[in-house]
Amino acid sequence: MAKEEYVSRMLVMLIMIMPLVAQGSRLHSWANRLEETGKDKVTNLQFYFHDTLSGKNPTAVKVAQGTDTEKSPTLFGAVFMVDDALTETADPKSKLVGRAQGLYGSSCKEEVGLIMAMSFCFEDGPYKDSTISMIGKNSAMNPIREMPIVGGTGMFRMARGYAIARTNWFDPKTGDAIVGYNVTIMH
């Protein structure tokens, strides 16, 4: 009886471990394949970021603020968590290519300046399931802003580069915005 129980337990453990071993070898071979590409590739991407703070289904929500944030003309200390749509064109109904997921916070007392920590997660096309990571200051009132790309995953592993942001549309009452991003990365 004890021997049968031992064999049963071993079979269950083996069944549970096999998929993990198989998955690990697939991930390893995929990672090696990416590393063997040789020279860096330069990729340029254009997409639109739809930041919606208003309505029944906002994609950006305030998650924290300082004690004096409401008194500040720049909302200094406000922190927002986002899951914003990325589309092919500025039209919100255009093709969804991914999501911008991360956070931004008002980090300047004298100007509208945001510190942004964002992953652009691609859900369609040749870059499906790949991401690029951006972190840096966004001087939101400037017509053109540049922020660094500091990493990536999937097809963009080891990415570095820059993002140029231009506000396409902004509603000062709600804070909703559509921002065009032109991203140049080496990977």
From Swiss-Prot:
Carbohydrate attachment residues: N182
GO biological process entries: phenylpropanoid biosynthetic process
InterPro entries assigned: Allene_oxi_cyc_Dirigent, Dirigent
Gene3D superfamilies: Allene oxide cyclase-like
Main location: secreted
Alphabetical keyword list: Apoplast, Glycoprotein, Secreted, Signal
Gene Ontology terms: cellular component: apoplast
Signal peptide annotation: 1-24
Annotated localization: Secreted, Extracellular space, Apoplast
Record function comment: Dirigent proteins impart stereoselectivity on the phenoxy radical-coupling reaction, yielding optically active lignans from two molecules of coniferyl alcohol in the biosynthesis of lignans, flavonolignans, and alkaloids and thus plays a central role in plant secondary metabolism.
Assembly and binders: Homodimer.
Family, per entry: Belongs to the plant dirigent protein family.
Full protein name: Dirigent protein 23
Organism, scientific name: Arabidopsis thaliana (Mouse-ear cress)
Lineage: Eukaryota, Viridiplantae, Streptophyta, Embryophyta, Tracheophyta
